[in-house]
């Protein structure tokens, strides 16, 4: 406190707001890091593929006219017709690229310098003119970089496909963190989970496809926006039931982890990528361990193998005493999926550095609270699934009958999975009552019901995992229909800004009403 007559001492400035969230939503929320140098967006996109990965990666936005049977010619060049939606999207995308932003910044700087030069004479004018010439050289370099990025749209048939644009829209909306996901047991076959042959390593087909799709997106997006613009959370799900696992012990665990990491790096970085200009392997952002049965096998050997791969291996020169990296780390961080509190504590006590834990935790399901308490104690981030109950906590389903599992519903993660979740929280009538409360709170604050459910997770200290919708439905998971059209959205993200503010819009009355909706308080499942 300052003495009388003294100038008041200014309070120390807090962390600066995240520039993207501030620009899009007027948010003062500071940027958050998953790990040092690895951002974590407020909402994490959980990606289930809408189609086979091979088919998605074979798509092309480039129109190909019918072939003339009388002539043999190579593929026609892309035609950027001004009326084509792809052309409009290309222009918008190009304007957001790092090279274009740099060119724009330098152009403004050059104009300012030209004005300053006009008012100077002698040595001052010469110095300022030299500065201007240097900026002009940088502008020429930036123009070349812009031209290269523009050409890359023509060279990359995936660059303007619907699925690529959907992921781009989400990242442009400030949600730059993506997680591999998909329907698990019992909604997929055991063969899909564990492959044809008993093996300790997970089959290439389970998360392999979504890894390749997200890896392709990451490489494309970072070509436009710069390195580190997208973060990927991967999953390792070993087959703990196989004979190879039970008899192999720790060596089998190490071999399985190493094989998985190498395959995942190829999926994410491409066959020729994943190496820095200095020749150092680029590490994966995060690997989350999925453990099917804690009674069948102990996850600790796998966690220790992951820990080793998340640590630079060092060597000391006997003569000079200098320390150098003999084996760079292959992953940056380790996460856990659905580990109960006792297993999480065992991993922590074993010295495994856990970055984050993924659980189901929502306004209706609070069974993971012991895990949240432990994470708060040790500074571990929590990723929360189930915020919108697979998409059911939406105005669309208020007063509606249950969805038909035969007909399906594109606005839900999985109709069978959602119906099972409804049964777990007390049935359709119980869901309708809860949805009416949530809708009332949403109307009170001028937001979508999905926003209320997700904000509750954020206020609980979690980072919500929201399942991605695709193409024209890209913003449907946040309650916005038809928002992929620029004419409808005006280029604004289809998500309510109050989700990203520091202060919650939920008041005391809202919190009390939502507290009464909890339907599941049982202990977390081990698996």
Curated annotation (Swiss-Prot):
Superkingdom to which the source organism belongs: Eukaryota
GO cellular component: cytoplasm; cytoskeleton; motile cilium
Region forming the signal peptide: none
Chain positions with Asymmetric dimethylarginine modification: 191, 366
Region (Disordered): 1-22
Gene3D superfamilies from the UniProt entry: NADP-dependent oxidoreductase domain
Enzyme Commission identifier(s): 1.-.-.-
Record's comment on post-translational modification: Asymmetrically dimethylated at Arg-191 and Arg-366 during flagellum resorption. Probably methylated by PRMT1.
Keywords: Cell projection, Cilium, Coiled coil, Cytoplasm, Cytoskeleton, Flagellum, Methylation, Oxidoreductase
Subcellular location: Cytoplasm, Cytoskeleton, Flagellum axoneme
Enzyme category, top tier: oxidoreductase
SUPFAM superfamilies: NAD(P)-linked oxidoreductase
GO-annotated molecular function: oxidoreductase activity
Coiled-coil residue spans: 101-153
Keyword Acetylation on entry: no
Family statement: Belongs to the aldo/keto reductase family.
Function: Flagellar radial spokes contribute to the regulation of dynein arm activity and thus the pattern of flagellar bending. They consist of a thin stalk, which is attached to the a subfiber of the outer doublet microtubule, and a bulbous head, which is attached to the stalk and appears to interact with the projections from the central pair of microtubules.
Name listed for the protein in its UniProt record: Flagellar radial spoke protein 5
Biological source species: Chlamydomonas reinhardtii
UniProt lineage: Eukaryota, Viridiplantae, Chlorophyta, core chlorophytes, Chlorophyceae
Gene name per UniProt: RSP5
